[in-house]
Design a protein with these regions (language model features):
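AMP-forming adenylation/ATP pyrophosphatase catalytic core
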Residues: 1-165
Length: 165
């Protein structure tokens, strides 16, 4: 049904965009209508860039409105972008990973074409010695006790899953 589709897309956009509230129904409805047309390429809604390529729909966070100005202390939990819990066992400063190439997306992956857009939205930790630490990405459920799910890695980034709850 249309209402179910709108709610589903709204939750995805809310989670990816890091917003407290979902976008308005009318805007999501217009987005879903446009997806059914053959001329859809790219739209933005709720800080999310929605792209259609071949048989895939991609929801990628826009780089703007991201706050990287965090001084990270050892084993202290931070909320990054309203959707990630961040914890580190080394002190440092949070920086944008725009110039860092993760090279962990294989060329045959559907995400390969958008790897630069994805990398720009993932934070990186610059230690006090100047070393760059890539995050360990994980997903936790919002309903579970997050303290049990979060382990102290060198630099952990935990996505708070709001889509399936």
């Amino acid at each position: 049904s249309d209402l179910y589709c709108i709610k589903f897309f709204s939750k995805i956009i809310q989670t990816v965009g890091g917003k407290k509230y979902s976008p308005k129904r009318k805007q999501v409805y217009e987005l879903t209508k446009a997806l059914l047309k053959n001329d859809f390429k790219k739209r933005t809604l709720g800080n999310v860039c929605v792209l259609y390529n071949k048989d895939h729909i991609f929801f990628i966070r826009e780089k703007r409105h991201l706050n990287y100005n965090l001084d990270i202390k050892v084993n202290k939990k931070y909320i990054f972008d309203g959707r990630f819990i961040l914890i580190s066992n080394v002190p440092g400063k949070l920086i944008c990973s725009e110039k860092i190439n993760y090279n962990n997306i294989p060329p045959n992956s559907p995400f390969y074409e958008f790897k630069n857009l994805i990398n720009k939205t993932i934070p990186c930790l610059q230690t006090l010695e100047g070393k760059l630490v890539k995050p360990h990405l994980n997903i936790i459920n919002q309903k579970n006790n997050s303290n049990e799910s979060i382990k102290s890695n060198s630099f952990g980034l935990y996505l708070i899953n709001r889509v399936l709850i």
